[in-house]
Amino acid sequence: MKKAGLLFLVMIVIAVVAAGIGYWKLTGEESDTLRKIVLEQCLPNQQENQNPSPCAEVKPNAGYVVLKDRHGPLQYLLMPTYRINGTESPLLTDPSTPNFFWLAWQARDFMSQKYGQPVPDRAVSLAINSRTGRTQNHFHIHISCIRPDVREQLDNNLANISSRWLPMPGGLRGHEYLARRVTESELVQRSPFMMLAEEVPEAREHMGSYGLAMVRQSDNSFVLLATQRNLLTLNRASAEEIQDHQCEILR
């Protein structure tokens, strides 16, 4: 029994190391690609030529751009026009920082424009990955379709999600998540990053270890979903895992 336990522990350690190596390979010399697109292409082109290309939209005064992602027919990214690496940035808990999740929700209309018809709100999800769950070191929120199985699970747990951060029953995609219900008025007034930092014990000191997602519910409320990195369970806190960039939910 002791040998079996030791073997299991060794396997876990190997898996954790492999996950770490994989992460560093993914975040090598190309990890600044999105930042270069925003700061060296989209922003200058908008300022000099009033043309957001290659972005779909550039709002210098509001501090963000929207870019069509190369993965998936309808996936877009919302990014700041200045340097923010990701969820670990203290700027995200500064009240003067734009409410990027609310801005990303407004940008969902780009999905409908690309699709050629309205994409139902129930099919849309927003997600940002943790520091170890991302491949780019420029803050970006994924605007894309939700996985049908995640949509069903959230629908089935509508009554179980409260206005406090509580464990999502059964987790999502094999990982533990905290879920919190928010109204639209709450979301307009306060960033989900601030809600997480201020309401979940010790979250403020470890924001970079969290991935965060947002989905609209059938009662017109929103549910925030937060997952924290735990390499022992092979969870890199990539909240993007709740999304389906091929948009099966629309078929």
From Swiss-Prot:
Catalyzed reactions per annotation: a CDP-1,2-diacyl-sn-glycerol + H2O = a 1,2-diacyl-sn-glycero-3-phosphate + CMP + 2 H(+)
SUPFAM superfamilies, per database record: HIT-like (SSF54197)
Pfam family, one: CDH
EC number(s) on file: 3.6.1.26
GO biological process: CDP-diacylglycerol catabolic process; phospholipid biosynthetic process
Matching InterPro entries: CDP-diacylglyc_Pase, CDP-diacylglyc_Pase_proteobac, HIT-like_sf
Cellular compartments annotated: Cell inner membrane
Record family assignment: Belongs to the Cdh family.
Protein name: CDP-diacylglycerol pyrophosphatase
